[in-house]
Amino acid sequence: MKLDLYIDKDGQKLRCGYTTGSCAAAAAKAAALILGGETMTSVKIDTPAGLVLDLPVEHCRSYKNKDGTAIGEAAVQKDAGDDPDSTDGIYIYARVSYRNDGKVLIDGGEGIGRITKKGLFGEVGEAAINPVPRQMIEKEVLKVSKKGFNVEIFSPQGAEIGKKTFNKNIGVEGGISIIGTKGIVYPMSEDAIKKTIYLEIDGILQNSEKKEILLVPGNYGEGLKEKLNTIIDLPTVKISNYIGDSLSYAYSKGFKTMTLLGHIGKFAKLSIGIFNTHNRTADTRMEAFVYYLAMHGADKKTIETVNAFLTAEEAFNYLVENKIEMILKAMERGAEERIKKYLKDDSLSIRVLIYSMKYGLIE
């Protein structure tokens, strides 16, 4: 059952989804009902967003474990709507048993990550189940019975899916996190992406003695750092298109030495002062090349040739192949100066490194 809730974003009608926290709460409630002898195909839960979700439940069963304890078990499949969420389609399971003290004890099992660093939402060693989902789970199972429950949340796909998330960088290993502050996934939430970036920076501040940070837009740049001894050991944060927001936050946290490593497609924009590199914000890649070529005395034919390219990758490679890669170095220095102006601090130590997929980093 798909969630019939939509938002309008940049003129597009996008479908919302529900969080892993909502899945866990619904699965736990269903498992508690099963433990009491009920059968169902869906359960209703309240969300912090003020919406009531009616979520389909699957893989329902009741049984006794080896010591004779009665167990209820159920699963809910995550629906991320139109959000590009790596956990979309994953099954979140709950396994519950009764207590007699009215308490609800919640833990994570297979596929649920464990906290490995201080400064997150729980203690080191605890299951990566955020506070709001914990509250949702407790609220829903206590609707079924006031006896209390032991609740184990697990996901057989979680260990593999967790590798595709930001988890390891923020101090969660071994699986996915059960998250969500509203219970609803709002598509392409820029705030959510930025909060993840900020959380990574906070994690580095808490757990690293390094006073320098490496910011990369994506996975390829992170892998490329292995080729540079000067940055190979730097704590790294993937910042997507949010260069300005990430720089400002890192600077506010005391980082005064920062290296940025990125593809020419994004950093051409940065070289002329574009700090959100999403193509809907600005597409000034060729304009950047034209500016730096003109400033360094390139002839009209060269400028026109570069301006006619469709991608920044082509332009980068053309400059290398025609031995005018000094323009690329000028773009790196230009980006560094733009960052200092953006942060209003000329004393910063900023290093910008630009690469192409074909030639890698320029020497």
UniProtKB/Swiss-Prot annotation:
What are the UniProt keywords, alphabetically?
Answer: Cobalamin biosynthesis, Methyltransferase, S-adenosyl-L-methionine, Transferase
The biological processes this protein is annotated with in GO are: anaerobic cobalamin biosynthetic process; methylation
Pfam families xref list: CbiD
Any one Gene Ontology molecular-function term assigned to this protein's record: cobalt-precorrin-5B C1-methyltransferase activity
Q: In which pathway does it act?
A: Cofactor biosynthesis; adenosylcobalamin biosynthesis; cob(II)yrinate a,c-diamide from sirohydrochlorin (anaerobic route): step 6/10
Spell out the reaction equation it catalyses. Co-precorrin-5B + S-adenosyl-L-methionine = Co-precorrin-6A + S-adenosyl-L-homocysteine
**Does this entry carry the keyword Methyltransferase?**
yes
GTP-binding as UniProt keyword: no
**Which Enzyme Commission number(s) are on file for it?**
2.1.1.195
EC main group: transferase
Family under the similarity heading: Belongs to the CbiD family.
Q: Which HAMAP family match?
A: CbiD
Identification of the protein by name? Cobalt-precorrin-5B C(1)-methyltransferase
Q: Which gene encodes it?
A: cbiD
